[in-house]
Amino acid sequence: MGTRPDEPGDRMSAPPTDRLAHTSSRGVFVTMGGFGGKTLIQLASTVVLARLLSPADFGLVAMVTAIVGVADLVRDFGLTGAIIQARKLSERMWMSVMWLSVALGIGLMLLIAASAPLIAWLYDEQRLIPLTLAIAPILLVNGLTMPMQARVQRDLRFGTLANIDVVSMLVGVGLGIATAALGWGVWSLVVMSGAGQVYRLVALWVASRPRFGRPHISREVLPLVTTGGSLFGVQLLNYATKNLDNVVIGQQLGPAALGQYSRAYALYLLPMQQLNGTLGRVALPVLSKLQDDPERFRRYTRGALMIIGYLTIPVYAVAAAVSSPLVAILLGPGWEEAATLFSILALAGIAQAIGSVLGWLYLTLGRAHKQLLFFVITRPILIAGYFVGIWWAGVEGLALVFGVLSLLLLIPELVYATSGTFMRVRDILAPIARPLVLAPLCFGAAFAVERATDGMPAILQLVLGVAAGVVPLLASLAIPAYRRDLAQIVGFVKQVRKPARTAPASDAAASGSAEPDEPTGESSAAARSDVDEVILDDAELARERKAEP
């Protein structure tokens, strides 16, 4: 079956290496732009909806989504990650994946709808029955969406995904705010989620133009299901860890307390979604294509970790220090508990920002089964911590135990995730060591100023606190090692601005069948390697060290 000209199809399973650097680095920034747009829209929705709705409204929806999310994981069954990691996929396999995903979506939609009374009984909240029935169809929408999104992502069409992400969120948030202003209450949150997902389905359908064929699930899809099964186990345990806290709080303390926690948790996720989500969407397909090239794989991973280290760890440190004025500005009065919870959750944010990169290693190196084994052992510890924490000190105790355990469990996982691979523990620790040193300094400076300005307008407290938190970052540039780190990040940015290199004319002529937009010179005439262009190579670093005074 032929491939349409505008769809890379299977040729993207092994793209020419001399375009991979440009594609991946530009993909990071295109995707970051998309996530940046989503972050601004999400912040705007948080600011507006927190003033139109009550904490209990957010808590009711969080109760339902904590359960529906489990069904959505079953619906995906790890197939998204398996598709991205696979070296090659035939058109027949694509059709089978699409029909399998649709079947799972329909089945789980009906199961959740039938379980609505049980969910209401669990929380002792009858208002959850109609909410559950209204949210359940999202499972079918996601079942249709998943294979199309995986295909677009596998084909490295990051600009398309970024545009769809932003517009779908804009559609959902716009309708959610409009209905909240009209007095729809909790139902405006249902509208916001559903409208965005429906638009996403339509946009991805247009972008990928799927061919479903006749209803049939081929046996060729079994390897994907096998790989996906391990990923599903990991995702299920991870989801349980990240959502059973909602169930525990909602069941023990009610929707109002859960509403405070859910808004704090949403703010805590923003830095991680913006940066780790951006890099992860690009890194997974790129690293999967570099799994047979250890040196380039290590360089790309170290570079991504360095960016995460400098742009995530200090952000959490400063945001935790100024959480009171930050939450007062974003959410308004009545959300003071959310500010305290956000500060505590920042501990988990730092641990999970680093831990997400370990997830890349498991997936792209085909070791999902090892991650599943680690999660089977460690995730029950985190879940038990929820019960200990809420018994000890309520919702704040739960958040603190979660943060501390997340940091402690990261240490053995560093060793476990790299054992038996060409990756070394040093490859993970070296890029984040210097940002970790800066984190307490940034927190201390920001917190001191925030306390000293207590009583001033919240916006002034926030600006002065953030400015103080940035001072240690700027002062660190007096140290050569930090300047070298900055040079590597700048080198990444420069790569984005360079046009993608094409093959010499002689090579193109010799090939005879090259398409105009495809590089053809993959011989020894190719200059620097692909990922070496994304992260400055050792020779360039050596020259920079010599040039420093």
Q: Which ranges hold each PLM region?
A:
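Signature of the first transmembrane helix
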Residues: 2-10, 20-77, 104-116, 133, ...
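Membrane-proximal transmembrane or re-entrant/amphipathic helices at the cytosolic face
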Residues: 2-18, 418, 423-425, 444-549
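Alpha-helical transmembrane segments of multi-pass membrane transport and lipid-handling proteins
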Residues: 2-9, 13, 99-124, 130, ...
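Interhelical loop/hinge segments that connect adjacent transmembrane helices in multipass membrane
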Residues: 3, 9-20, 24, 159, ...
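Membrane-interface junctions at transmembrane-helix termini in multi-pass inner-membrane proteins
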Residues: 24-25, 82-90, 141-165, 182, ...
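Transmembrane helical elements of multi-pass membrane transporters/channels
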Residues: 27-42, 189-192, 196, 200, ...
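Specific pore-lining/lateral-gate transmembrane helices of multi-pass inner-membrane transport
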Residues: 85-101, 260-376, 492-494, 498
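Hydrophobic alpha-helical transmembrane segments
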Residues: 129-136, 164-210, 223-229, 234, ...
